[in-house]
Amino acid sequence: MLQALQKLLGDPNERKIRKYLPVVKLINSLEIEIASLSDAELRAKTTEFRQRLDRGESLDDLLPEAFAVVREAAKRVLNLRHYDVQLIGGMVLHEGQIAEMKTGEGKTLVATLPAYLNGLTGKGVHIVTVNGYLARRDSEWMGQVHRFLGLTVGLVQEGMSTDEKRRSYHCDITYCTNSELGFDYLRDNMATDIKEVMQRPFNYCIIDEVDSILIDEARTPLIISGQMARPSEKYLKAAQVARELIRDEHYEVDEKARNVILTDEGFEAAERLLGVSDLFDPKDPWAHFVFNAVKAKELFIRDVHYIVRNQEVVIVDEFTGRVLPGRRWSDGLHQAVEAKEGVPIQNESQTLATITYQNLFLLYPKLSGMTGTARTEEAEFSKTYNLEVTVIPTNRPIRRKDAPDLVYKTENAKWKAVAEEIAHMHAQGRPVLVGTTSVEKSERLSAMLKEMGIPHNLLNAKPENVEREAEIIAQAGRKGAVTIATNMAGRGTDIILGGNAEYMARLKLRERLMPKLVQLDPDNPLGSASTTSRGGGQGFGPASPKPKKSWTVVSPNFYPCELSARTSQALDEVVAAAVAKYGLNRLPELVVEDLIAVASEKAPVQDPLILQLREVYNSIKAEYEKVTEAEHEEVVRLGGLHVIGTERHESRRIDNQLRGRAGRQGDPGSSRFFLSLEDNLLKIFGGERVAKLMDMFRVDEDMPIEHPLLSSSLENAQRKVEVYYFDLRKQVFEYDEVMNNQRRAIYSERRRILEGENLKPKILDYMRKTVEEIVRAHVNPELPPEEWEIDKLTAKMQEFVPLLKENLKADDLRDLSYQEILDHLIKQAELAYEAKEAFLDTFEPGLMRKAERFFLLQQVDTLWREHLQQMEALREAVGLRGYGQRDPLIEYKNEGYELFLEMMDNIRRNTVYNLFVFTPQLVQVPQVAQAVPAQAVAASPETGGVVEADFAED
């Protein structure tokens, strides 16, 4: 029915694409005219466009000509010309949509079109990538187009100074990572001086791999935290208790919700083992520790969710299979896993500032993104982010054949069939990529292939395999290659049929340069300081130390040919030149990695050594390409890359990403998934239906099962998971929306304080409100005056404003009305404030203004931190109210709002009180000191030294 309707009305995506075709035609018609311009005339177009914007033309008016200018600039600078489909992609991005573009279709080049057009406004364009390497590569490579046309291009990287970042954020186009962008946003909202603020107001953002950031990472909060000590012995005892407790007797595991529930017997057993009467005793709480210990035991599996390296628990990204050094699970969970593994337990942290990617990117007035797979998540992009998905046609037709799934009764039978399929393809000479879902499963298959004598490469989160990522990917498309990869989806690298000559040339440079340039570890003179490789696997931390470090590729016959005598000599000469310039074994490993990366990219450079390195790199690449291109043709004839999936992922999108590794840029290829009724997806989400199917199919284990009921069960299971996780993300979004509204309010107020020249009117308003509160607490106008608490009121006012101790008497207020008392006390407080200001002016003119800003920021930051903890506790508490027929979200909104109002009142009261009670302390300092946030600094006229006015309270 749906297909018939689509046929009648036409595919909505096709209709969308058709509306862009007249604009593509117009851009193409301008090509000859724009090509005739000189470089200077082409560059002058930028000034012309900006003037036209000033005169009232819109970006849409400029689009055809601006796109034609970018296309011409890319031809001249990069020797790349935008295809028509790439122009459509650029228009989709400019309109604030998501462009789905298949692997190898040139997403990076597409982004130059809307980035240039929107960069003309001068309000800033952010191009966001998933790692620092890609951000730098794109800023240097694609940035050439923008620089050629006269736009400024910035790059934000981890470890840059505040000034460097500010300069980059103030460029027309800024390349950065999603995490650095988010952390800088939070840092800006913790700044104590407007000079520390790095970012401008957000304008337009293009996200590369948008599904990875807005869907997969949506529930991951960015957190800036401070250390908070927590007793490690509690984690260790809780881990011992968890080991004693028995599943299904003492606790139940909800794998779908990734949670554990203790039974009554479980509570009794835990209390008995710990020697306590109540796990929830507020004076000695144990419940949180025990729950986390049981979660660590049942739900967090070594070599699946984390690995242990150098006595540390390191998280493995479930989507990409990469390790995430530096990331920690929150809420004591990481400590529970550390206790389980018997490694040192690190301190918990207190949240100082936090935001989710969902709310960070919703701060942009215009947002767009690119990815190879977004259609399956179209509903979520639309509902959560108000983003439309448009599928961009490929430049060449897709030739990949996707075979139907083969489903086996048992897991053993499935793995046996996978191994046989690999052997069959390997015998034909076709390269094979096998996707697995965990380190453990990849090693199981590897062991089977070893027994069968099939050579293969293993790519998973284990340090020894991480090191070889570039080497493995470089040859994954070669004839007869077999590659087993854990969660290949997020690896962000193309598999090129016949082998990747660029990677191979880079590895040859690395093999020769690293042993000569990298500094030696004094404790390990045979090896380097670190065993980390970044040659294609950014984002990995240091691996376990090895007795000797070698950068030589492991695979025999890795390089497609021996280098010619001329190129070998040029390589020897450039290595000698590098040693002459930098010294023998003097550079950190990452510096040498960067040197090789810059030499092998296309970005413009001035350094003679890098230019020499680049020349040698290009010679090596050219020699390798002669062989790899011939092999490419042979592999194409054999049928291209064959992709094998060994389990359905929870998301169809991730399955599609794995399939998409085959058939890039019009190459042939094929894919097939091998599944079993014992796979996690079917076990957890297929439920009883699958159990019945298992009884129904009384067939031999080695026979694949094909049945409409089974296919629908699979699809239903996957859809259930997608809906389940969408609901989870939606729930996170709804709860975080409450926090987001509060965050926006407090950050806006904070920015006004930071930017405000004169905060005195705000402080006087705070003071009047606080005096009114004090009066209302002690004087009720509806009661007779003899019942008013005048003595208590006087004492409270004297406590609040110490300067009134001498002048304010209770007897002065007894015969006054409520309004007269209020007016009199406000007047007295104002006079006291003026007196305090005059007193401070004797130390330094304008010192009161500095004090106002200091105390306001101090109170906002301190009370916001406490508020974050209260909101976290509230969120945990309201979860239980669902059992009482009350909506937890509404309860969270209402009580969260009350907590927020209370925090704002406390900011007001505390700031005014601190301003009245603080006393400057004079400290003679022999020379100009560094500014300290808690101090105001003024020159001493007598000595020319510095007087520090410390904002100390009495």
From Swiss-Prot:
The terms under GO molecular function for this entry are: ATP binding; protein-exporting ATPase activity
EC top class named in words: translocase
Q: A Pfam family this protein belongs to? A: SecA_PP_bind
Give the location in the cell. Cell inner membrane; Cellular thylakoid membrane; Cytoplasm
Q: Which reaction does it catalyse?
A: ATP + H2O + cellular proteinSide 1 = ADP + phosphate + cellular proteinSide 2
Positions of the region Disordered?
520-549
Q: What is its EC number?
A: 7.4.2.8
Q: Which family does it belong to?
A: Belongs to the SecA family.
Q: What is this protein called?
A: Protein translocase subunit SecA
Give the UniProt keywords, A-Z. ATP-binding, Cell inner membrane, Cell membrane, Cytoplasm, Membrane, Nucleotide-binding, Protein transport, Thylakoid, Translocase, Translocation, Transport
According to Swiss-Prot or TrEMBL, what is its membrane topology?
Answer: Peripheral membrane protein
Under the subunit heading, UniProt states: Monomer and homodimer. Part of the essential Sec protein translocation apparatus which comprises SecA, SecYEG and auxiliary proteins SecDF. Other proteins may also be involved.
Q: Spell out the GO cellular component terms annotated for this protein, sorted alphabetically and separated by semicolons.
A: cell envelope Sec protein transport complex; cytosol; plasma membrane-derived thylakoid membrane
Taxonomy of origin reads: Bacteria, Bacillati, Cyanobacteriota, Cyanophyceae, Synechococcales
Q: Which NCBIfam families match?
A: PRK12904.1, secA
- For this chain's UniProt record, which GO biological process terms are given? intracellular protein transmembrane transport; protein import; protein targeting; protein transport by the Sec complex
- Identify the residues that bind ATP: Q86, G104, E105, G106, K107, T108, D494
Q: What does this protein do?
A: Part of the Sec protein translocase complex. Interacts with the SecYEG preprotein conducting channel. Has a central role in coupling the hydrolysis of ATP to the transfer of proteins into and across the cell membrane, serving as an ATP-driven molecular motor driving the stepwise translocation of polypeptide chains across the membrane. Probably participates in protein translocation into and across both the cytoplasmic and thylakoid membranes in cyanobacterial cells.
